[in-house]
Curated annotation (Swiss-Prot):
Protein name per the record: Small ribosomal subunit protein uS13
Species this chain originates from: Symbiobacterium thermophilum (strain DSM 24528 / JCM 14929 / IAM 14863 / T)
UniProt family annotation: Belongs to the universal ribosomal protein uS13 family.
UniProt-listed Gene3D superfamilies: 1.10.8.50, 30s ribosomal protein s13, domain 2
GO biological process terms held by the UniProt record: translation
Keywords carried by this UniProt record: Ribonucleoprotein, Ribosomal protein, RNA-binding, rRNA-binding, tRNA-binding
Cysteine disulfide partners in this protein: none
Domain of life of the native organism: Bacteria
SUPFAM superfamilies to which the protein is assigned, alphabetical: S13-like H2TH domain
Residue numbers spanned by region Disordered: 96-124
Amino acid sequence: MARIAGVDLPRDKRIEAALPYIYGIGWSLSREILKKTGIDPDTRVRDLTEEQVAKLREVIDHEYKVEGDLQREVQMNIKRLIEIGCYRGLRHRRGLPVRGQRTKTNARTRKGPRRTVAGKKKAK
């Protein structure tokens, strides 16, 4: 089993489909990395040689921010927005959508489950 950037890649998948298991690498970046290393995208992970795995590991570690480093950078960016008190920082702090989406309805992913508010009493 190939272990790259602290992630065990699934043995039975093609290397092109296995690389996106690493946080920060999607399909297009996966193809770009394989082109740089000269590895055929249709190769299965189990069929990679140690030399190919080492080449992949070197390219990913030296040229791209992935996994923990990338997650840390994203968190630091959010923390900076909150500290400077900008609008985006306030939205992050309040747990609301940051990019201008509506909040009268929807936005449940950001806001979490509904909190029921007591209704008005019916007048007699």
